[in-house]
Amino acid sequence: MPGTMQCLGAEYLVSAEKTRQREWRPQIYRKCTDTPWLVLFFLFWTGLVFIMGYSVVAGAAGRLLFGYDSFGNVCGKKNSPVEGAPLSGQDMTLKKHVFFMNACNLEVKDRGLGPTALCVSSCPEKQLDTLEEVQLFANINGSFLCVYSLNSFNYTQSSSADTLCPRLPVPPSKPFPLFNRCIPQTPECYSLFASVLINDADALHRILSGIMAGRDTILGLCVFTFALSLAMLFAFRFISTLLIHIIISLVILGLLFVCGVLWWLYYDYTNDLSTELDTEKENMNCMLAFAIISTVVTVLLLALIFTLRKRIKLTVELLHVTNKAISSCPFLLFQPLWTCAILIFFWVLWVAVLLSLGTAGTAQVMEGGQVEYKPLSGIRYMWWYHLIGLIWTSEFILACQRMTVAGAMVACYFNRNQNDPPARPILSSLFVLFCYHQGTAVKGSFLLTVTRIPRVIFMCIYSTLKEPQRSAWSRGEFRCSHCGLWCLLKYLYHLNQDAYTATAINGTDFCTSAKDAHTIIAKNSSHLTSVNCFGNFVIFLGKVLVVCFSIFGGLMAFNYSRALQVWAIPLLLVAFFACVVAHSFLSVFETALDILFLCFAVDLETNDGSSEKPYFMDPGFLSVIKRTNNLNNAKSQGQKDALPNEEGTELQPIVR
């Protein structure tokens, strides 16, 4: 009898009889699925392209990257003149540092720093007590510390030198990558300079400047993460019992080491804290949060490892079967490479647009010919739309990878003639994806996106609350909401993978595929749940190992450059990159396991093991399933060793 199924506000007509009679074999003739969602994604990306274009035109990322003076010139670049500002439009190619004429007495006035800022070729590393010393420094180093309109020969002769030159004595300073500023080195001047420059800077600028200040370290850690993920991928390809024990040992050591280092760094910060700097307090609070989270994760993982330690041998056999299935289309192992390349390209583009959004503003000439940049309020608040674009597009790219892997493995699994494997299964799967099922990938990625966004909003709201406002009730509410959304996200992730696999087999839309897959797995859940958990847990430990070593490298690298850096944000960026890259690489095995189990359930549903309807499954896979279920039955109910299907027919080896 036909019925209706509701999915994301739309009703789909589902025939029960048609569902029962579905052949569950890879379809040759297909139709486009979830086309409205593909149109929606296209319209969303039209908005993203508009933001990209407008931010590039209106923004000036160079001001953030290289720093700028008080007259509208970006240091280290050749500038265009600003109308009404006579000292603008100068060639600052050789003048790469920002120097404040009164660095020891900075004030914030109307979103701008009061003292005049100049572009100089080098910072004075020794204290200059007189104008003669300032003039000598200019003649020797070619670095002019007075306003551009005053010639260096007139430093000691002009009556206006007191207002056009820095206040004496000029403190020694050194260049620092944060905004390319000359940072005073005397303790008194440094604390005053830092408290104004950092604490009163725009929050978005502080985050972006922290990322740019540590860009080389971030890039190096990303390369390290990429190499470690690749090594872990090939380690799982040639898995063994010894290797599993090594991975588990490294994970335990890594968790304990990272946890200990985080608590040690937090203790170090609490005993060596500059109360003038809010960024130091932010770093300390982030360090405490990192330490608590790592401790909880360490305890939970150690408990799980201890509980599942006796299933290691079966897990190795299961991964051997998975490797055998992957070997039928070995290029699946290289699938994460192009996925990772596309993700990196998109993230670089996203960060470039974010930099432009953060610096979008119009030049306004003030009294005395100085130039101030007034932010464009409308464009600057578009970063929320930009953030949604980051999450949705990243999830879409990963969804395309999962559907490609599903299509290739399905074609290899449902192949009777083992001597004649499918030709180019990956290319065929890609062709089917881009011609018919992009809308399904968009819909699945949208589900994950709308689940992630509330988590981001909750974290932002909670982080804005001051400590007195964080009552026990609000903390408990936040943790429950965060935990609930995390569980929902994990459920949707597995639902999406099953839906993609069903779509790859039957060519149906997302909701129909999800329903069919859920129904057929539910009938065989007793056979599959425990086995699937073991394999996924070991793969998860591989991801944890990559993330642990990446975070440890980040802790060691960023801790050596604390001064004036919001380095908790770059560390979070490295951790996020490590999670995504490790997941992108090792998800090939995780995806392959999920696909194998769904295909196994389909096999049980549509075949009975007889000579007329033999199973497609590999005998090794059948053996692992039977041994695992026998172990479970012996521990719980002592049931018989044979693994029955729904009708009670004993599974038979595949007929060759």
UniProtKB/Swiss-Prot annotation:
<dbReference type="GO" id="GO:0016020">
    <property type="term" value="C:membrane"/>
</dbReference>
<feature type="transmembrane region" description="Helical">
    <location>
        <begin position="381"/>
        <end position="401"/>
    </location>
</feature>
<feature type="glycosylation site" description="N-linked (GlcNAc...) asparagine">
    <location>
        <position position="524"/>
    </location>
</feature>
<dbReference type="Pfam" id="PF04515">
    <property type="entry name" value="Choline_transpo"/>
</dbReference>
<feature type="transmembrane region" description="Helical">
    <location>
        <begin position="288"/>
        <end position="308"/>
    </location>
</feature>
<feature type="transmembrane region" description="Helical">
    <location>
        <begin position="337"/>
        <end position="357"/>
    </location>
</feature>
<feature type="transmembrane region" description="Helical">
    <location>
        <begin position="566"/>
        <end position="586"/>
    </location>
</feature>
<keyword id="KW-1133">Transmembrane helix</keyword>
<comment type="similarity">
    <text>Belongs to the CTL (choline transporter-like) family.</text>
</comment>
<feature type="region of interest" description="Disordered">
    <location>
        <begin position="634"/>
        <end position="656"/>
    </location>
</feature>
<feature type="glycosylation site" description="N-linked (GlcNAc...) asparagine">
    <location>
        <position position="506"/>
    </location>
</feature>
<feature type="transmembrane region" description="Helical">
    <location>
        <begin position="37"/>
        <end position="57"/>
    </location>
</feature>
<dbReference type="GO" id="GO:0015101">
    <property type="term" value="F:organic cation transmembrane transporter activity"/>
</dbReference>
<dbReference type="InterPro" id="IPR007603">
    <property type="entry name" value="Choline_transptr-like"/>
</dbReference>
<keyword id="KW-0325">Glycoprotein</keyword>
<protein>
    <recommendedName>
        <fullName>Choline transporter-like protein 3</fullName>
    </recommendedName>
</protein>
<feature type="glycosylation site" description="N-linked (GlcNAc...) asparagine">
    <location>
        <position position="141"/>
    </location>
</feature>
<feature type="transmembrane region" description="Helical">
    <location>
        <begin position="216"/>
        <end position="236"/>
    </location>
</feature>
<keyword id="KW-0472">Membrane</keyword>
<feature type="glycosylation site" description="N-linked (GlcNAc...) asparagine">
    <location>
        <position position="154"/>
    </location>
</feature>
<feature type="transmembrane region" description="Helical">
    <location>
        <begin position="242"/>
        <end position="262"/>
    </location>
</feature>
<feature type="glycosylation site" description="N-linked (GlcNAc...) asparagine">
    <location>
        <position position="559"/>
    </location>
</feature>
<keyword id="KW-0812">Transmembrane</keyword>
<feature type="transmembrane region" description="Helical">
    <location>
        <begin position="537"/>
        <end position="557"/>
    </location>
</feature>
